[in-house]
């Protein structure tokens, strides 16, 4: 590894920079100033920031402000960054002071040095291509960083949406597979009334569908960008040609239906769009954690718990208890949800803390939001592959639970009244006798009447299902 350095200067002073580095003095200062998380800028964010620099170079060249040779070199350097060829040159921490200036200058320096190299200049000279004058022409950290953030959110949401669509599909399959499995529904963890296991999973599928649609709608929050507004939304140092063409040119590069904000002051100051996206991601995570709590309960045991379903055995569960298997996949999904809830709180506080014309805390918003989206997508993927697809039902045990529960006494209420039904239920719990047995013993109803009234499948039919079944019975 070379120890040679070059001397670079900025408004703070001079500094030795590794001779072969494409980053420069400002990125190096930022690395030294912010040794915070050890997490670098998200690679998708880096790619999108380079897309913006590319669009800016094209737009400035078309406006006659950036010479052809410089523009071509900048575009070529941007393409290399977009392809991931210079990934190690982005050295600043994801969480940094300065509203993202360090990230922006890290990009400007890398592109300037690579573009200058293409034009025959040594790294650090900046004679042909300057980080500020050429790469950052007609831009400010305050419009390129939030725009890159929005593009990154859009890129990251796409695989999450696909994962949720797969999860919804797998849950729907389980709903169909378990439609004839009847178990005891519980409210507040106490026996309630019968429910089909298929209905339980259908409810999960509907929940995931709703979350997926919320996330799809959240896209709209990200399509409006403040690019062209520069520092505070006044578009200072921006030509008319650049102002009106930069967003359409970026739209062509990204494929997203971007539009320039009508109120650039608002779009520069406020981060409510990111708060909204974080909120729907958090909501989805909370919903999935709730489902995973249910899966852990329903699979508990195997002998002294609920034992209604079996989760795939994925790994040994104990270093001391032989044969123990834990519900590790639902557990990790819930932990991801806890993590995301914390991120959402951070994002909320950072958005609230903005002052006057700019929010200085975009870096922590982006760091947390990007991680929330990517970890949730990975959690959904492992939930599908390592849990949902392999779930099986303990049919006999579910049937035994129904037959032994006093909860089915609820079905007697329309026929013998609430008070009498409650007495039957209490007696069943006290004596251990079944509801059916007690009703017959007391001569309250006949066996034939009970066959229909206490039919657990009929108890679980809803709406049209019930009408169709009644019609079939009458026809017989």
Which role fits each region the language model picked out?
Residues 1-476:
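Conserved, well-structured ligand/cofactor-binding cores
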């Amino acid at each position: 590894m070379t120890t040679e350095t070059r001397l670079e200067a900025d408004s703070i002073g001079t500094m030795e920079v590794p001779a072969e580095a494409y980053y420069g003095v400002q990125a190096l200062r930022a690395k030294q100033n912010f040794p915070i998380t050890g997490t670098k800028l998200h690679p998708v964010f880096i790619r999108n920031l380079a897309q913006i620099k590319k669009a800016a170079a094209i737009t400035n060249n078309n406006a006659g402000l950036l010479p052809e040779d410089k523009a071509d070199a900048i575009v070529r350097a941007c393409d290399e960054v977009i392809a991931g060829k210079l990934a190690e040159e982005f050295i600043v921490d994801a969480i940094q002071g300065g509203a993202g200036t360090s990230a922006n200058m890290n990009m400007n320096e890398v592109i300037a040095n690579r573009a200058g190299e293409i034009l025959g200049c040594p790294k650090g000279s900046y004679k042909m291509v300057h980080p500020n004058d050429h790469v950052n022409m007609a831009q400010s950290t305050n419009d390129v960083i939030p725009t890159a953030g929005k593009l990154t959110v859009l890129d990251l949401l796409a695989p999450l949406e696909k994962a949720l669509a797969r999860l919804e599909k797998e849950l729907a399959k389980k709903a169909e597979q378990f439609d004839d499995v009847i178990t005891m529904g519980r409210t507040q963890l106490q026996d309630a009334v019968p429910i089909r296991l298929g209905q339980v999973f259908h409810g999960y599928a509907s929940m995931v569908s709703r979350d997926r649609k919320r996330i799809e709608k959240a896209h709209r929050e990200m399509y409006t960008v403040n690019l062209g507004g520069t520092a505070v939304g006044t578009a200072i140092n921006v030509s008319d040609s650049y102002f009106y063409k930069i967003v359409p040119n970026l739209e062509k590069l990204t494929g997203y239906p971007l539009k320039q904000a009508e109120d650039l002051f608002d779009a520069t100051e406020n981060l409510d769009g990111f708060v909204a996206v974080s909120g729907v991601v958090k909501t989805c995570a909370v919903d999935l954690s709730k489902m995973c709590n249910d899966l852990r309960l329903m699979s508990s045991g195997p002998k002294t718990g609920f034992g209604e379903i079996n989760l795939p055995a994925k790994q040994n569960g104990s270093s001391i208890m032989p044969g123990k298997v834990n519900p590790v996949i639902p557990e990790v999904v819930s932990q991801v949800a806890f993590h995301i809830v914390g991120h959402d709180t951070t994002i909320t506080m950072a958005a609230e803390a903005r002052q006057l014309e700019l929010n200085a805390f975009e870096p922590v918003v982006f760091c947390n939001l990007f991680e929330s989206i990517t970890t949730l997508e990975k959690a959904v993927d492992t939930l599908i592959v390592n849990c949902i697809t392999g779930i099986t039902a303990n049919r006999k045990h579910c049937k035994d639970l129904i037959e032994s529960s006093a909860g089915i006494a609820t079905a007697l209420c329309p026929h013998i009244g609430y008070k009498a039904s409650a007495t039957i239920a209490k007696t069943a719990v006290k004596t251990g006798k079944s509801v059916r047995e007690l009703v017959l013993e007391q001569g309250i109803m006949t066996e034939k009447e009970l066959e229909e009234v206490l039919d657990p499948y009929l108890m679980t039919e809803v709406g049209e299902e019930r009408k169709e079944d009644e019609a079939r019975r009458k026809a017989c």
